[in-house]
């Protein structure tokens, strides 16, 4: 169905807004996917807070110009689906990677992470990045480790003295 000019402008505005607020974008060719597979991809994307859009390439190119997602413009050809993540850098890559495990028909053409183009062969590396919450917990554990070690060391000195005194008392009783 052909879109009229107003509808095209609305699509460009929506995709442009998504591109401006997103931290990562993924481009994948969906040729050969069934409706059921596409529905599964969309539901897994929703679970991961990823927005998927199928847009005509000419409209997508207009929408992505002058945004940090502009780096994926060279791979916009053929029937592609765009995935946008607004918070997690690796979310789009994780959605595509998990979907490809069961459906080989989805072909990732490239990713844009913080304005940098990432080749599709680096999908696994980007997908394995920790989420924001995981990264915070790792940093907190690293920051907490020296404090815990200091606390254990400070507690151990009086405990050693107590054990020595107990041993001396036991020795004198015998």
Swiss-Prot record:
A GO CC annotation given for this chain: ribonucleoprotein complex
Keyword vocabulary terms for this entry: Ribonucleoprotein, Ribosomal protein, RNA-binding, rRNA-binding
Alphabetized GO MF terms: large ribosomal subunit rRNA binding
One example of a Gene Ontology biological process annotation: translation
CDD domains in the cross-refs: Ribosomal_L10
Pfam families, alphabetized: Ribosomal_L10 (PF00466)
Classification via InterPro entries: Ribosomal_uL10 (IPR001790), Ribosomal_uL10-like_sf (IPR043141), Ribosomal_uL10_bac (IPR022973), Ribosomal_uL10_bac_type (IPR047865)
Subunit structure: Part of the ribosomal stalk of the 50S ribosomal subunit. The N-terminus interacts with L11 and the large rRNA to form the base of the stalk. The C-terminus forms an elongated spine to which L12 dimers bind in a sequential fashion forming a multimeric L10(L12)X complex.
Function comment: Forms part of the ribosomal stalk, playing a central role in the interaction of the ribosome with GTP-bound translation factors.
HAMAP family: Ribosomal_uL10
NCBIfam families, sorted: PRK00099.1-1
Family listed: Belongs to the universal ribosomal protein uL10 family.
Stated name of the protein: Large ribosomal subunit protein uL10
Annotated source species: Vesicomyosocius okutanii subsp. Calyptogena okutanii (strain HA)
């Amino acid at each position: 169905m052909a879109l009229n000019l107003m509808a095209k402008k609305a699509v460009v505005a929506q995709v442009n807004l998504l591109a401006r607020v997103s931290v990562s974008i993924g481009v994948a060719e969906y040729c050969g996917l069934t409706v059921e597979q596409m529905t599964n991809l969309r539901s897994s994307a929703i679970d991961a807070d990823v927005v998927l859009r199928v847009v005509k390439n000419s409209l997508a190119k207009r929408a992505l110009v002058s945004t940090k997602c502009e780096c994926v413009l060279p791979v916009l050809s053929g029937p592609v689906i765009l995935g946008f993540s607004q918070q997690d850098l690796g979310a789009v890559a994780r959605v595509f990677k998990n979907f490809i495990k069961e459906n080989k028909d989805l072909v990732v053409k490239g990713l844009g992470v913080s304005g940098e183009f990432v080749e599709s062969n680096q999908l696994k590396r980007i997908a394995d990045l920790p989420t924001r919450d995981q990264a915070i917990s790792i940093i907190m554990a690293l920051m907490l480790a020296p404090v815990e070690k200091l606390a254990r060391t400070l507690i151990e000195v009086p405990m050693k003295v107590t054990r020595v005194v107990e041993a001396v008392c036991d020795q004198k009783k015998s």
